Regions:
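Sec-dependent N-terminal signal peptides of Gram-positive bacterial secreted proteins and lipoproteins
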Residues: 22-45
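Domain-terminus/edge residues, biased toward the C-terminal soluble/receptor-binding domains
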Residues: 211-461
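Active-site-adjacent loops and short helices of periplasmic peptidoglycan-processing enzymes
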Residues: 6, 43-231
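Short, Lys/Arg-enriched N-terminal segments with co-localized hydrophobic residues
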Residues: 2-19
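Structural motif marking the loop-to-transmembrane transition
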Residues: 23-24, 100, 150, 448, ...
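Short, hydrophobic/aliphatic alpha-helical segments
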Residues: 39, 155, 259-263
């Protein structure tokens, strides 16, 4: 058995994906070649109409470079809902109706894939049911009773968006489509989605007692942000062409990646398209540029015959993000004051009344009327080294604020690790992180029994 993402040796050939840069170079060379052919046709007297139309349709998909610096947004978008998200922090950098729930078609399959990767194994045998085989186009044309490796079906799912494949995977992982939908919705909540309801694993327009199948551009971006952290998911969605067979080897298949955005920019690292009558054209993508990760989410981005709208919108959002956001570490070490503790003593320090312990200077500061010194404790922020290295995409002029809330005084007893405050990092009204401040040691309460024991100990020792 092997985990998904590992390469399994079989008798047939697999063509794994090109690198992002090589795909981009190939696209540019192909475009140049077609342009040369068009020019040659004109020179020789041939109209070259078909070639001109082909080139025109490709060029129109790629918007002209514009200066997006210091703009309020990417300009007009075709999509009804759109989000540009910081793929690392989850912060929404731009949104247009980003929190409005809409049908999301085959972008649903991002969730289907990630659940299969987490719950299944690449060598799992997946049996095709009558229900799976009867799914509508687009489909691989699976037949009832056939068996496939789960890994192979994931390439069919993500490269060509086959609906029958999605149902076969769902029934294998969740026992049924309904059982898998429950898993999908639970995972969505775990990721942080707030207005998502899944009914099917393939995204076909559907509804159940919980409502219609839908999500928001913001939730979809969160799901993609989560998915691209999985190396196997990235490997699958970056693969250009893939070949496989059923378990018996009798039926052979080849699938080609339908995510054309991979060829339009070297920044694209993953993506999934979708279309239904209710959803329109949808798209979700992940892009990386200079260690910045951008997630692009588009819902209702045109209806036939406007398949190219999603590419234009995606490129606009990407260019806007690249021009306006830089990466910055936002940790700030706050100065935490010592906190006085009433009616307590720090036995671990060996302090005597009114005297300062040389090993812990500054802990006993004043005499009280009781003959005992006030005890001061320090706070410790519960943040790891990785927490202190967190980064976020910021626009010019944006500032992260660090706010410390701490108890002004405490009353004994105090236990080590007891919460005594909180540090909050914010960007405007958006709270990025909260970290507890805890007591650095135990403080014992001074009682009559403690006094008696103290007198007895001092007298006999």
């Amino acid at each position: 058995m092997h985990s998904l993402g590992q390469v399994r040796v079989k008798y047939y050939k697999r063509n794994v994906g090109w690198t992002m840069k090589s795909r981009y170079r190939f696209f540019c060379l192909t475009l140049t070649f077609v342009l040369v052919l068009c020019t040659a046709g004109q020179v020789s007297g041939s109209t070259g109409t078909d070639e001109k139309k082909a080139v025109s349709s490709i060029v129109q998909m790629i918007p002209a470079a514009v200066d997006m610096k210091e703009t309020d947004g990417p300009g007009n978008l075709y999509a009804l809902s759109a989000v540009l998200m910081d793929g690392d922090s989850g912060r929404v950098l731009y949104e247009k109706e980003g929190y409005t729930a809409r049908p999301n078609a085959s972008t649903t399959k991002v969730m289907t894939c990630i659940l299969a990767l987490e719950k299944g194994s690449g060598d799992d045998y997946v049996m095709v049911s009558e229900n799976a085989a009867s799914q509508p186009e687009v489909k691989l044309n699976l037949k009832e009773g056939e068996q496939y490796y789960l890994e192979d079906l994931l390439y069919s799912l993500m490269l060509k968006s086959h609906n029958d494949t999605a149902v076969a995977i769902a029934e294998h992982i969740g026992g049924s489509v309904e059982g898998f939908a429950k898993m999908m919705n639970a995972k969505a909540k775990e990721i942080g989605c707030t207005n998502t309801h899944f009914v099917t694993p393939n995204g076909l327009d559907s509804a159940d007692a919980g409502g219609i199948h839908q999500t928001t551009a913001r939730d979809l971006a969160l799901i993609m942000s989560y998915a691209v952290k999985n190396k196997a998911f990235l490997h699958i969605t970056q693969t250009r062409d893939y070949s496989f067979s059923d378990i018996t080897g009798k039926r052979q298949f080849s699938v080609h990646n339908a995510n054309a955005f991979l060829d339009m920019t070297p920044d694209a690292i993953s993506g999934k398209t979708g279309f239904t009558g209710n959803a329109g054209y949808c798209y979700v993508a992940a892009c990386e540029n200079e260690e910045r990760k951008f997630i692009i989410s588009l819902l209702g981005c045109g209806w036939p015959n406007n398949k190219t709208y999603k590419w234009k919108d995606a490129m606009k959002l990407l260019e806007y993000g690249k021009a306006n956001f830089h990466k910055e570490t936002y940790w700030q070490e706050p100065e935490i004051p010592a906190i006085p503790v009433k009616d307590g003593t720090d036995e671990s320090s060996g302090k005597e009344s009114g005297k300062e312990n040389k090993e812990n200077p500054g802990k006993i500061l004043t005499e009280t009327g009781t003959g005992f010194a006030d005890v001061y404790i320090n706070g410790q922020i519960q943040a790891s080294d990785s927490d202190k290295k967190k980064q976020i995409l910021l626009k010019e002029g944006e500032k992260i604020t660090c706010h410390l809330r701490i108890e002004k005084n405490l009353t004994a007893p105090v236990k080590k690790g007891q919460k005594i405050g909180q540090v909050t990092f914010s960007l405007g009204e958006l709270v990025l992180d909260n970290y507890f401040v805890t007591a650095d040691r135990n403080i014992v309460k001074i009682t009559y029994l403690w006094c008696a024991n103290k007198v007895f100990h001092d007298f006999f020792h």
